[in-house]
Amino acid sequence: MDSVIIEPDEREALASLVPAHPLPPRKTHSYVEQCEQKPHHPIRKYSLDEGSRSVTSDSEAVYFDSSDGEFSTEGVAIVDGRTSGERGNGEECGFVTPPSKPASQGGGNDGGREDDIESLPEFIGAGGGLDVFKVPVRAAVNPGRPPCLELRPHPLRETQTGKFLRNIACTESQLWAGQENGVRFWNLEEAYEVGCGLGGQVRRGDEDTAPFHESVPTSPALCLLVDHGNRLVWTGHKDGKIRAWKMNQPNTTTADDSKPFKERLSWQAHRGPVNYIVISSYGDMWSCSDGGVIKIWTLDSLEKSLVLKLEEKHMAALLVERSGIDLRSQVTVNGTCSISSSDVKFLLVDTVKAKVWAVQHLSFSLWDAQNKELLKVFNIDGQVENRVDMPPTQGQQVEDTKAKFFSAPKKEKSQGFLQRSRHAIMGAAGAVRRAATRSAGAFAEDTRKVEAIAIAADGSIWTGSMNGVIAQWDGNGSRLREVNHHQQAVLCFCTFGDRIYVGYSSGYIQVLDLGGKLIASWVSHNEPVIKLAAGGGFIFSLATHGGVRGWYVTSPGPLDSLIRTELSQKEMAYARQDSVKILIGTWNVGEGRASRGALVSWLGSAVSDVGIVAIGLQEVDMGAGFLAMSTAKETVGVEGSAVGQWWLDAIGNALDERNTFERMGSRQLAGLLISLWVRKSIRTHVGDLDVAAVPCGFGRAIGNKGGVGLRIRVYDRIMCFVNCHLAAHLEAVTRRNADFNHIYRSMVFSKGQSVYTAAAAGASTSAQALKNNPNTNNSTEEEKSHLASADLVAFFGDFNYRLFGITYDEARDFISHRSFDWLREKDQLRQEMNEGKVFQGMREALITFPPTYKFEKNKPGLGGYDSGEKKRIPAWCDRVIYRDNQSISYTECSLKCPVVSSTIMYEACMDVTESDHKPVRCKLHANIAHTDKSVRRQELGKIVKSNEKLRAMFEELKSVPETSVSTNNILLHSQDTFIFTIRNTSNSSRAIFNIVCKGQTLVREDGEEPDNHSRGTFGLPRWLEVSPGAGIIKPDASLQVKVHHEDSHNSEEFIDGIQQNSLSEESSDKEVTLIIIVQGSCSTRTISHSIKVRHCSSAAKSLSLVHSKTTTMTKNLEGSTRYQTDANRGGSTRHRTDDSTRRG
């Protein structure tokens, strides 16, 4: 017998392995003899357990949990501009065999048998440790960002149809969320509790969510507003209604209660959707809608409606509806309106200057909250606009007309088929380029649109745009500065203390100081952050997929490392492991169709124990006409063909998709088609299918060559499957390598056909359009490949790599003797992988089947190789290559290496003759480690409650700077002004204050009981001005607050938008209680001072007010209240000689 022939690189790899125990005697056979005796006899394997080596040390690696931030490889927190280190150098190629493992390992239910799984030897390409080809390193707890409270883990997208979360808002003890079908809220005291589980009553997608309570079904909730004064949460809805919900819902004290709660009040506010609602400094509710509509619902009408009984809801709704004030009609003169008719997307209340900002995408309008007057209209550059309601331009129509004329075909002389085909293809490519060029200007304008607005504690206004620019404005609408820390769209803001939190479309959260300087940055979600909210000691973030996380207000800081260390030690409590078998099939069908028998032979005979099936086809349909049509369809977001649909249906029938498998999705690009099926028994653990396409033909514009991909979440880990057709011809090795590199780096996944951009045929998403826009300066963090961050990536298809340095006859001779070991030495792909030029760091099982190209159709056996004039040399064009979380050596499956795979089948179906290629199938066995999010959240709660150091840190957050107020009683007459002082007596902490009105009392002259009128929304009465109404006081400093009486504002009531003035209150003295709420820069508790302000209707009615001690009210997070006297505090500044007579 001949000895086994091993290639030099394989011999070096095997020689480097040093087993811990002596290996049993190994039988030696030549591959020829082996294949003659039994075509697929397993080769005896070497154990690699003791020979494992990691390419990168843990201290050098970039960690992130794929279940948290799998689409971004740069999950690194940035603090004061410092980032974590880079990973190591490139890996070398190798030839390894993973150890056999039992099929029952893990809890996966993929129909697998319980016998041992024999893994095949695999060749590993070099270069896997460089650039985007680094293997992503995971960890049980991500050290690249602060630890978080996962209130609602990322649900699978398909479970959220019709009930996606759209926004969030936070109270002192609750987090509310607006949904597509209503609202829900969480009690924060239950935030660390376990979820209801699969057996609970909660719908699919919320099994691991912390206990929550849900409302009755409604129209989609587009916005939320917390009203602390009335203890209500207001919501604006797509159907134009505004609804009020009580914070203290009855019968929701326990998590077991599943009865939906109902709204307290609702009315028809707008004809279109309610885009935003706010409550002004004077207690009025402002709402906005499409078409430039802004309405005001006065405090008086709201309060009257809220005192009505529940049985009188209809009357209450009618009362509010008739009180609405349409501001657009009030600023329209002779048919010309002073504000734009474009949609009003946001409203912002400036509590410092008592103003309201209305935000349209490219302009702002500034309003006086007290008298509802329009103050200013200006654009995003800060330039004042006198008239903005102009008729729309026809420029785009003209351009479209020009495009039609320019693209019209001209009569030409008769041409040959190839010439006409070339013109058709290049004409389609030219149309794509013209469309992209024509839309570039509009795209640049769109990137400047305002997507978010917020007010900081110092009264500065911050806006964020699609291009990542953050602009700072003063309260008068003057643009002060702009910063740009991230080249992605700003989607939301949140302010807490003296910090500004920014949420980006990339999933990043950044923390800025009041000057716009970057403090910290981290990847919070794998999808865009659409809303941020502060409360309960957390900054809560909501991503587009519906996941909700809470970040501690101290993060990043010392608290993070303590929690991370403790939680990592609890890994065994929440780590879980499952397994699944994956069948991957590839076939170049040569524009033909297959019989059912061929499909069953290829796929049906191999799926009995498989959980996932990924199929890639090439040359489904070709020809110049089809390619041109396909390119044109791609430009308008349409893909697929009748032939492609036939293949999907035929393969589905072969897989028995009605009973056994479920088709998850597909993507077609010209002749390339990829589709994926999942066994129904594991369907609840698989979802979030995304698609992608990258053309490589004709200047990267046409899909005759290229790749199509599917990305899917399996047991909370990300797997990517890419079907490729690379450049043809023996000498085009460099082009094939370049095609792979282009596909790997350019593939951007999206949620489906509706989000495909029309800018270019190969543009997969709008995100890629933003990335490729020449006006956008991209940083390295956006240039990372989506494939680089996946846990498992499988490439398959017609790679077109050929055999080199060998003749047709020599190749046929080797094949007839099954001497595949000699042929592999002539394989272009093996050589290029060996040199680290392509498929860097990826694996391919040892090929033990004959070359799959090129055959004569319908000619069986090995005699079917091409015997025509060209006599193309047989080659292994059709391949399957993959990588998982392992580096070169075998690694045990764990949360640090969550996907560990091996090849258990790799063969060609030589009996199928419908094409000039043979179909290939490969079966992978994947062990998958993942986290039980519900249990981990519970473990986090135990750590927070039991760790003494953490408890001490949380206690420190309750500290509030000592402050004093110069008076607690103010007496005003008509047009009087009084100035009092708030002093921060702390020498180290800044004090942040906000002034609200608790209530109003009408003092009767006839000695009757005073008429107490609570200010439910904490709004000021219209006769009183307080300036500033909020701000920051530096350590050991003071700030003056002006209180002014305005006698021109009477009690207002509006009926059908017409003001009804009431003068009954003018004869009575009025008294209000101002509450000054004070907190520190990072306080979770507040201290309040109260001041009584009394207005006398005439000088003769002046009363001597008895000076009393200032009372402070301290409110902690649990809602308890304590009172303490303020009489002996030092540092008070008095701006009056007598509280009862001094007037400003």
From Swiss-Prot:
The gene is IP5P14. WD repeats lie at residues 158-196, 216-255, 269-307, 445-483, 524-561. Residues 791-807 are annotated as: Catalytic 1. Gene3D superfamilies: Endonuclease/exonuclease/phosphatase, YVTN repeat-like/Quinoprotein amine dehydrogenase. It comes from Arabidopsis thaliana (Mouse-ear cress). Expressed in young seedlings and flowers. This is Type II inositol polyphosphate 5-phosphatase 14. Residues 1111-1131 have a biased composition (Polar residues). The keyword Hydrolase applies. The lineage of its organism: Eukaryota, Viridiplantae, Streptophyta, Embryophyta, Tracheophyta. Pfam families: Beta-prop_IP5PC_F, Exo_endo_phos2, Ig-like_IP5PC_F.
